[in-house]
Amino acid sequence: MATIYAAKSGKPPEPKQFYRDLATPGTLARKAFTLPYGLHAVSAMNNPAIRAQPIVSFGGIGSAAALGKFYSMLANGGEIDGRTFFSGKTIEWMTTTLTDGMDRVFQIPTAFSAGFMKDARNAKRRIFGTSPIAFGHPGAGGSHAFGDSENKIAFAYVMNQMEQSLLPNEKSLRIVDAIYDIL
């Protein structure tokens, strides 16, 4: 399958309350997304000098190939190339929804397993495909990666320039939809 998309792919609607909170000192969104570079933290991540810094929980930078390999290993029971990195029990915790409801930072319905995001029960738009056990995480700026052990799918999408976005961009979501449409 090959499709050429325009450079600007469009963005799904972003949660308006999140941006209001981001502009308000003292809110969870402001605390979570403005340290250490202020309100320009997302655009600052496009600077190679900033990207070289070890920023805990805000600097996960990798290639689509590396993310795809990671989620491929998870979607295949924690094993890759004959080596087991995670037990079946650990993978079960990754696929099991532990919390589901309104996210206090993003201000949208979210769900989480042990360490990963999942589609919320009442999500308006599924971002991890059709399987209820799929898990992963969108990246700040539009990136997106997940594993689906039910369908043996690993998906990773990154861009060479971050967008001002919290959620996967429309281009990546159309690719996810196309993958599941051919199953």
Each language-model region and where it sits:
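Short, surface-exposed loop or secondary-structure junction motifs
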Residues: 1-129
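Short, local alpha-helical segments
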Residues: 51-52, 136-139
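A conserved acidic, glycine/proline-rich C-terminal tail/linker
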Residues: 132-134
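Structured C-terminal helix/loop/strand segments within mature extracytoplasmic catalytic/sensor domains
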Residues: 138-183
